[in-house]
């Protein structure tokens, strides 16, 4: 795993192909399906939808449920994730081993874990260029953090995948501006570096780790 740590330190991120076993990922997807079941049943009871779309595949069901009601689409699941279906991923042995290599043996899971559904043509799910540290204090770069992202469906340039600017973490915490839904890095930092931005296309089972900077 040392080459992963090297990529993380050098680029600010690292891609881990086929890192999460299918059984673990399936358990997470089933937990998400339960959350969507609950949403669908509530929408049906409220008369917002006339069918539950229960036979639609995992990757399409939320699109069907909210296609005509984008304003009701959840943009994030966070407190809902305190469920056993997610625990095996949170405490995945390979992720913990990697975290120890990156952060040292004293580690903690920051209680900000989330699932973000991304629906087509919904600006509330189009996350802008930012540093996670931009949402916290400016001196947070004194803390070493490792974020982990695991896709549940294929993520590519067409449907919207993660993007990174390699080595931009070396800038430390930079200025951000509040846009309608999210923070965005100030153009004085962003514009001169956009030429080096890369798309990170991933498949279920892959993982991406990245700096909060």
Predicted features, each with a name:
Residues 127-145:
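Acidic, His- and aromatic-enriched active-site or binding-groove loops in soluble protein domains
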Residues 155-213:
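Double-stranded beta-helix
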Residues 15-17, 108-112, 161-164, 209:
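A structural signal for short, well-ordered beta-strand segments and their strand-loop junctions
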Residues 2-10, 17-129:
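Non-heme Fe(II)-dependent double-stranded beta-helix
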Residues 107, 140-144, 155-156:
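A short catalytic or substrate-binding loop motif that flags glycine-/basic-rich loops and adjacent residues
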